[in-house]
Amino acid sequence: MKRLPAVAGSFYESDPKKLKMQIEWSFRHNIGPRDIPKQTYEKKKRDNLFFVVPHAGYIYSGPVAAHSYYYLVSEGRPDVVIILGPNHTGLGSYVSAWPKGEWETPLGSVKIDEEILMQLVKESEVIDLDEKSHLYEHSIEVQLPFLQYFFDDDFKIVPIVIMMQTLEIAEFLADAIYNVMQKNPDKDIVVLASSDMNHYDPHEITVKKDVEAIEKIQQLDYKGLYEVVEGKDVTLCGYGPIMVNLILAKKFGKKAYILKHATSGDTSGPKDSVVGYLAARFGS
């Protein structure tokens, strides 16, 4: 079973050469890390296990996303990347994993780690195997070219989209991922929470709203983040995936490090209506 790209040519370049140039542009951008990370091939224990990455078009959020990937790549190639994204389309189940096969982008194909996926399904009891949720969803797809640029097809993924972003679902998923990571100590597993921040307010208002959410992220306060999103009109689309990583970070004794916060007004133009973007890592 192969999942074909849904947003190549719109969110990112469909031509492989242009796409690689777009990724390099993201790293070298003045909002980005301004450098392309050097890969290490030495196998050592990874410090940064969990990340927040944005998922807009690369011209908007690519430079911010590059900050998270800089740290991920610098610690070597992971065996498995669990990618948690929100469900923007409304299709499919409340929590949906692509069941098997591979995902294709202009840079090639990446296989699903079916063994880790089935362990997660068994542990969580809330994950459905459902490809419908993923067919047109961009939040996971846009992460793959960044990973493929550095690791080619030498890693596997577990793509999970979350429509029901509740505290209970976040707790169930975090417990399941924690248990699976504990049962597979020889596998280098990384978890990405794919999310943009506040949407379509003027730049100053978006920054103010985002800062409230970022404070909760820094404190690993997933319940506080939920309250900010639900109670203060912060239109943060992937708070469910972020909550999962906040719970996991606390379980693993990690701290939150904010790598970059910016808006689409910073990266590509008008500031009257912007989207916020955050890159964060969770490590020692």
Swiss-Prot record:
Superkingdom of the organism of origin: Archaea
InterPro entries in alphabetical order: MEMO1_fam (IPR002737)
Pfam hit, one: Memo
PANTHER family: PROTEIN MEMO1 (PTHR11060:SF0)
HAMAP family cross-referenced by the UniProt entry: MEMO1 (MF_00055)
Family: Belongs to the MEMO1 family.
Annotated protein name in UniProt: MEMO1 family protein LS215_2219
